[in-house]
Amino acid sequence: MAKQGMLIVLSGPSGVGKGTVRKEIFDSDDNDFQYSVSMTTRQMRPGEVDGKDYYFVSKEEFEDEIKSGGMLEYAKYVDNYYGTPLKYIKQSLAAGKDVFLEIEVNGAMQVREKMPDGVFIFLTPPDLMELKHRIIGRGTDDMSVINKRMAKAVDEIKMMRNYDYAVINDEVPLAAERIKAIIRSERFSVKRVMPEYEEMLGDAES
């Protein structure tokens, strides 16, 4: 039986730097897992690439995927849909590949219900003032949207207790290294290693 891959879920409030930290992890030479590209209906930001950062689709296309059961999770956030296509995740995990998701907090909680064996990591800002500076620094939102994001961020940070790990994003390279250390440790946890030994012991006893 092929070893099942591990699902790694990174989420946190808007503006905390999830995408930046994820890029830092995947740009390093020692990353050996696959990134599952999320789907969204929001506008593409400068520097983003369709199919690499997100699949950018229309609202109608996204809702068609929901109706057909093609989404592992999805959420509507500040008037835009975000979600994770299911097919790629299932295929990769079944092939023994570790899969990395970078998703919104509500989506992560949906995944937790469906795939509780995943590794759930909450990326948090050093403080709320720094988070507001980061959102303003994007230059993509007006103050009404920024205020919505900040109110939502407070609610999302309260949900940190539902995660396995919390990582402070004070400096991007440090946050990336902390996450990689968590993943390395999880690969050697008893709950992930034991199924292989149970199969081996079963073969020895037969």
From Swiss-Prot:
GO CC annotations, alphabetized: cytosol
Residue span, Guanylate kinase-like domain: 5-184
Compartment(s): Cytoplasm
EC number(s) recorded for this UniProt protein: 2.7.4.8
Alphabetical list of InterPro entries matching this protein: GK/Ca_channel_bsu, Guanylate_kin-like_dom, Guanylate_kinase, Guanylate_kinase_CS, P-loop_NTPase
Chain segments annotated as transmembrane: none
Pfam families attached to this UniProt entry: Guanylate_kin
Residues that coordinate or bind ATP: 12-19
Annotated GO MF terms: ATP binding; guanylate kinase activity
Swiss-Prot/TrEMBL keywords: ATP-binding, Cytoplasm, Kinase, Nucleotide-binding, Transferase
Coiled-coil segments: none
Reaction it catalyzes: GMP + ATP = GDP + ADP
Taxonomic superkingdom: Bacteria
HAMAP family cross-referenced by the UniProt entry: Guanylate_kinase
Function of the protein: Essential for recycling GMP and indirectly, cGMP.
Family: Belongs to the guanylate kinase family.
Protein name: Guanylate kinase
Gene that specifies this protein: gmk
